[in-house]
């Protein structure tokens, strides 16, 4: 506990909140170009081949974004829209590609859940 004299000498610093998606620069979504599309394996105890893409955003950042849904048409040089939202079992993947916008087509034969999330 600081004394009053110590508080006068240097005031309390406010706690700065750190953003979970710095590459978006405060925007809800960002456009980017795929530089590489590949699969990675999740951490324990899960097992799969998760589809991800390396994306160069208009903000200048190069990020790894998850491609949700079953089947995709994304390839190198595809222009995609990226939103925030991490994938819990993929370390370092903090963004999602928005399906159904720009070059990323929606999920084929999907009956439900045609929201922005997929």
Swiss-Prot record:
Its main location: plastid. It comes from the Eukaryota. GO terms for biological process: translation. One of its GO terms (molecular function) is structural constituent of ribosome. It is found in: Plastid, Chloroplast. One of its GO terms (cellular component) is small ribosomal subunit. Pfam families: Ribosom_S12_S23 (PF00164). Keywords: Chloroplast, Plastid, Ribonucleoprotein, Ribosomal protein, RNA-binding, rRNA-binding. With S4 and S5 plays an important role in translational accuracy. Located at the interface of the 30S and 50S subunits. HAMAP family: Ribosomal_uS12_B (MF_00403_B). Belongs to the universal ribosomal protein uS12 family. Part of the 30S ribosomal subunit. This is Small ribosomal subunit protein uS12cz/uS12cy. The lineage of its organism: Eukaryota, Viridiplantae, Streptophyta, Embryophyta, Tracheophyta.
């Amino acid at each position: 506990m600081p004394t009053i004299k110590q508080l006068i000498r240097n005031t309390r610093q406010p706690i700065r909140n750190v953003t979970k998606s710095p590459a978006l620069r405060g925007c809800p979504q960002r456009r980017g170009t795929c530089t590489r599309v590949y699969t990675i394996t999740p951490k324990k105890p899960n097992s799969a081949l998760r589809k991800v893409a390396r994306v160069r955003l208009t903000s200048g950042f190069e990020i790894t974004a998850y491609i949700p849904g079953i089947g995709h048409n994304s390839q190198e040089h595809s222009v995609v829209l990226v939103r925030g939202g991490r994938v819990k079992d993929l370390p370092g993947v903090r963004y999602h590609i928005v399906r159904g916008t720009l070059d990323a087509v929606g999920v084929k034969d999907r009956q439900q859940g045609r929201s922005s999330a997929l």
